[in-house]
Design a protein with these regions (language model features):
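Terminal, non-catalytic protein-protein interaction segments that mediate quaternary/complex assembly
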Residues: 1-329
Length: 329
């Protein structure tokens, strides 16, 4: 997917050295935006392998979002990608799906405010929470021209004290003609590991929602406020603080995809040992690879809440070999 490669090049070429809470340093760029036309195929990366166990994790995470669960007790039976942020009983400080499907609203509103009563169709029984996904589905069926079809996973009071508040925190459905588009806003984006999952998950969501509301799928648009590439810790990370400009000078001189490998070779001769958390070499390798044709996705025609792993089928997927990146926690 060329849009992803352009994003990678943009962050590496224009970003600045930036330490952060994880202890793994980054090359960070402000406010990157791109759009992907989903009519041209499903945007699962082909410049590195994303099927197999990666696809398994992606789909089970997506279904977990839709479940509305605030814990990972079922999810961890299929994938361990959330284990680092959960307690021994699988509970999370913040869970995306919990806010998608069960967003809390105050018991005592201020004078003049308007809130739904307990028997409102989007209010969940037995708790004062609001089902944003059902709201979006109903609005798309009944009022598709609405500019208010917003789903939000950011609760300020929760985010202020959470171990890991939502990174991809808000998305908007927007209909143009007969096509359903989705725009995702993300406060923080790990370019090597997180963003490829985000692109695929929200494109899958757009596909599934479009199918259930009788629209053609349109575009996935993505805005990432802090777009970052992890570049290592200790001496490895510190090297980028001193030498990022030299790397960017070489990137500015690249005239063909193959020349990214020359930059990678230069980098590997200059950097100190300890590359485990350095994502830059792997991303340079991806930049040197030609994107292959996008695959197709098929989602079973059944209620959204009844979807299971086997109901999502990836077809005609071919990719370059996998690249391993270590997660910065």
């Amino acid at each position: 997917m060329q849009e992803y490669l352009d994003l990678v090049d943009s962050v590496l070429s224009e970003g600045a050295y930036k330490p952060n809470r994880t202890g793994v340093d980054t090359v960070s760029a402000f406010s990157r935006h791109y759009e992907v036309d989903l009519q041209e195929g499903f945007p699962l990366l082909t410049t590195k392998q994303m099927d197999g166990y990666r696809w398994n994790s992606l789909i089970h995470e997506f279904l977990w979002y839709l479940s509305g669960e605030e814990h990972i007790r079922s999810l961890r039976e299929e994938t361990g990608i959330w284990d680092a942020w959960a307690d021994d009983e699988g509970r999370l400080d913040t869970a995306y799906g919990r806010f998608w499907r069960r967003f809390p609203y105050p018991e005592d509103g201020l004078d003049g405010e308007t809130w739904p009563d307990e028997d409102h169709r989007w209010v969940n029984e037995d708790e004062r929470t609001f089902d944003q996904i059902q709201y979006a589905l109903d609005q798309l069926r009944e009022n598709p021209r609405s500019r208010r079809i917003v789903v939000n996973a950011w609760h300020p009071a929760n985010a202020a004290v959470s171990t890991l508040p939502p990174c991809h925190y808000s998305f908007v459905f927007n209909v143009q003609g007969d096509r359903l588009n989705v725009h995702l806003t993300q406060r923080s984006g790990d370019i090597a590991l997180g963003v490829p999952f985000n692109v695929a998950a929200y494109s899958l969501l757009a596909t599934a929602i479009a199918q259930r509301t009788d629209f053609e799928v349109g575009k996935f648009a993505h805005t990432v406020v802090d777009s970052h590439v992890y570049c290592g810790k200790g001496d490895r990370g510190a090297w980028y603080e001193e030498n990022l400009s030299a790397l960017q000078e070489r990137l500015a001189g690249v005239e063909s995809d193959e020349e990214y490998r020359d930059v990678k070779s230069w980098l590997e001769t200059q950097t100190p040992e300890g590359e485990g958390y350095d994502h830059v070499p792997g991303l340079l390798e991806q930049l040197a690879r030609e994107p292959l044709d996008r695959p197709e996705i098929r989602v079973a025609d059944k209620p959204l809440d009844e979807l299971a792993y086997e109901d999502v089928e990836l077809r005609d997927y071919d990719a370059h070999p996998g690249i391993s990146f270590k997660v910065a926690e």
